[in-house]
UniProtKB/Swiss-Prot annotation:
Official protein name in the record: Perchlorate reductase subunit beta
An example Gene Ontology biological process: anaerobic respiration
Lineage: Bacteria, Pseudomonadati, Pseudomonadota, Betaproteobacteria, Rhodocyclales
Pfam families: Fer4_11
The keyword Amino-acid biosynthesis belongs to this UniProt entry's keyword annotation: no
Length: 333
């Protein structure tokens, strides 16, 4: 029998403008320092920023399966530890304080890591391209992890829609790890329990923005309640319709959205002629965000041109985010 989920009264929602993310990993570090420094959590990055196109973290997560197909829950694969990147250490003491002269090498020898293929992208100069894709638990409207859990340890908070794993009820079945198509629940081998992003709900309860959002140096991230018509997330998703979920075909109805990137045209064709083709192939963006991305890119281009001509654009003003307080719950860190 499927677990019964009570619909929340409100839904906390995130939007990231991929045109402003600089890949600095400040959100990654903020989350790591706040939530995953305990035993068995070395390999966990509840929030990570990966280069697209690329293998991602864990490696090849986009093909692991899970989610829903025709409304039916799908079983995916549990990523092996090597796909997350086995944590490695440097002999800092030997090099810095004991006078060892040989080259310091990490141990064990690294084979993968959360940002293993950072900045590689695809294509050949001068038409090579990539962009950064920050990822976290999507706190889905239809969370596959919740339905899959055999111990009813996962629930969606009534007051804000954040999806949480009840640590006392979790028995380490890993059904959530298997069923999430975004690979965002993690199995803690020390505690024998699943861990995942908690949406910084202790901060939300105090009226403070999540750590990842508050620390974003590029003001690329927005957070708020989707029913708040004054919030930037409502405006970007519902009013201007320029923010899209990642892989909507997975069927979980994510509550983390993205403004797709616009990198402009290719520099030149193989024959040396100038090109008007987009540097990021449209098919690549459609593979991530669905067919609607074409319409969104057209809207963004139109509004950008308005600004360039000195005309008003409410949408661009929201995306510029001159005041952090307009983009999030209190930005206090």
């Amino acid at each position: 029998m499927a677990n019964v989920m009570k619909a929340p009264k409100r839904q906390l929602t995130y939007v990231t403008d991929l045109n402003k993310c600089i890949g600095c990993q400040t959100c990654t570090v903020a989350c790591k320092k706040l939530w995953t420094t305990g035993p068995g959590q070395d390999f966990m990055y509840w929030r990570n920023v990966e280069t697209t196109p690329g293998l991602g973290y864990p490696r090849n997560w986009q093909t692991k399966g899970g989610g829903y197909k025709n409304g039916e829950l799908q079983k995916g694969k549990i990523p092996p530890m090597i796909d997350y990147g086995i944590p490695f250490e440097f002999d800092y003491a030997g090099r810095l304080f004991e006078g060892k002269k040989e080259r310091v090498r990490p141990s064990p020898t690294p084979r993968s890591a959360p940002n293993w293929d950072e900045d590689q992208g695809a294509g050949e100069y001068p038409n090579n391209s990539f962009f950064y894709l920050p990822r976290m638990c999507n706190h889905c409207t239809k969370p596959a992890c919740l339905e899959a859990c055999p111990n009813e340890a996962i629930y969606k908070r009534e007051q804000d829609g954040i999806v949480v794993i009840h640590q006392d009820k979790c028995k380490g079945a890993q059904a959530c790890v298997q069923s999430c198509p975004y690979a965002k629940p993690y199995f803690n081998p020390v505690a024998n329990k699943a861990n995942k992003c908690i949406g910084c709900f202790p901060r939300i309860e105090q009226g403070v923005a999540p750590g990842c959002v508050a620390q974003c140096v590029g003001r690329a991230m927005h957070v708020g309640f989707i029913d708040d018509t004054n919030s930037s997330v409502h405006k970007l998703i519902r009013l201007y319709k320029v923010a899209l979920p990642l892989h909507p075909e997975f069927g979980t109805e994510p509550n983390v959205f993205y403004v797709p990137p616009v990198l402009g045209p290719r520099m030149e064709l193989p024959n040396g002629e100038l090109s008007t083709d987009p540097k990021i192939p449209l098919a690549q963006l459609e593979g991530l965000f669905g067919k609607q991305v074409r319409d969104v890119l057209a809207i963004l281009q139109t509004e950008r041109e308005k600004k360039m001509k000195g005309l008003a654009s409410d949408l661009m003003d929201v995306l510029i985010g001159r005041r952090s307080a307009d983009m999030m719950i209190s930005p206090l860190t």
